[in-house]
Every structure is written in structure tokens, then in C-alpha cells.
Amino acid sequence: MDASQLTRNLAGIVGEKYIITDPAKTEQYRQGYRFGEGRALAVVRPGTILEMWKILQACVEADVIVITQAANTGLTGGSTPDGNDYDRDIVIVNTMRMNIIQTINNNEQVVCLPGSTLNQLELLLKPLGREPHSVIGSSCIGASVLGGVCNNSGGALVQRGPAYTEMALFAQINEEGKLELVNHLGIDLGDTPEEILTNLQGHHYQRKDITQDAGKGHDHAYCDHVRQVDEPTAARFNADPARHYEASGCAGKLMVFAVRLDTFPQEKQTAVFYIGTNDINELTDIRRAALGEFESLPVSGEYIHRDAFD
């Protein structure tokens, strides 16, 4: 299939309004927040997860590279091409039109579609007396929920650790080289990809369809793991295999259509402390005491350079 045929097929899926091929108009999608830029055959903006699936089918058939992109706010790249030395054409699938969030299990969990943002989730949960795992992305409040899960974001979070779930709906190329949809959300949505995606998009399921013990909705062990201050390795580092599970930490190797996550009771009384010193060893002592000795862990913590502090 040639490039022009693929773009026609993609336009047939989403409509001419939601496919962009003009390089001047695709630049905002092809250029990263901090770094990374390259050519793309097209940017496609599906309005439903069924359209997203059909786009992926067409791209796999055409043997092009697919980059799934949400808010494009990441500081470490991965949401855009990086250079122009790829061996195939690239299609960017921007997910921000699909921003549905569904609360389940008495608001103790949520199901988030690819375009939902952390800020949107926080505002949804606040009147319910709940809060999400993370309340801000690495760079701004526009960061997506799924982007955080796919990249295990949340390095400053001490109590809850990196974004993580074992419950997701995703597509992968299997060992036979075939595209398949995998429903590990723990929600009975039907049998075919079309049924699963349509029923999820429309919230066409009931409480009886939800499996309660389908997997973890956050990293339950991190609060103990982070207290091990005498271990030879850091508790938190990029691409930690201990926090890779299907969609979690997949970093673009899967196309993720939805994740199921835990929510948390709102913190009633919190305070922010700024601690300044000219001796980095004092900060090390404070960190070791807070992690190793405090009865309650800090919600989050971050080192800030004196220039930023001032």
C-alpha cells in the first residue's frame, strides 16, 4: 500500500477534518515539548477508540511506524519522531479527542480513555472526596493519564510511587505477527474488538460485569520499597523492570485504549515545607530520616536547585 492510499484510508476512518498531512500544520504534533522532531506522513485524531483501532489496523497493514501521542507534554521524548532517519513512514495518532473518564466501584476506581488528563481527573474526583494517583504531569497540568502510566511517571511521589496498573485494554502484535486486542481491564465488554471498544466507549456495562480482583490499580508495595534507604540501588529510576506490566511502562510498544486505576481519599491536612541548605549532606540526612523513621511517609518530595528556589 502506498502512502497516498494509506492517507485516503485514514481519512475514510476519521473524516478529512481529523487527518493532517501539511507539514506546517503537523509541526505542533511532530515537535516535542523539550526535544525531538521529525517528519510524519500524517497526524490522525480519532474521536472514538474504535476509530483508533481501525487506524492501527490500517497502519499495520501498510507497515508504517505508529507513534501514539496524547498531550505531548513529556520531558523525556517518545511522543514525537526524533530525527528523519527512520526506515519507514510514520503516522502520529493523537488521542486527545477521546477524553472520557468513567468512575466505578463507588468512585474508588476509574477507567480512563487515552485523551483524559490528570487535571480533568482531579476535577472530576474532587467533589467525590477522592483524588487521583497523580495531580500534575512532569511539565504542566495538560499531561494525560495514560501517558503517565505508559511511562511510569510520578518520580516525586513518595507514598504512591510511579503510575502503575495491571488492568488495561491494549493492542499488540503477537508472536505470529498478527494484530490483536487484549482486554485485561477486568470488565466483561464482549468478545470482538468492535464489541469491546464500542461498549467501553459508551459505558455499556454494569457492576456485575466488573471483576473486583482483576489486578492492582497502583503499586501497593512502593511505600515499603521506598523506605529501604540502605539498598545499593535507588528506589526510583527510569525503565525500572519491577514496574513494567503490559501497559504500565510500555513506552509506546503497545497501543493502549484504556486503563483502570485506583483513586484515593483526599488528604485532609497537608503542608508544604521548603528546606534550604548549603550542605547537601544535610538534605541526605533529612531524606533518610523521612523515609526510614517517619511513621507517615511524605506525600511527595523533590530536590530543587537554588536558582529555581530563589
Model-identified regions with their sequence ranges:
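Short, structural beta-strand-to-alpha-helix junction motif
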Residues: 48, 73, 109, 116-121, ...
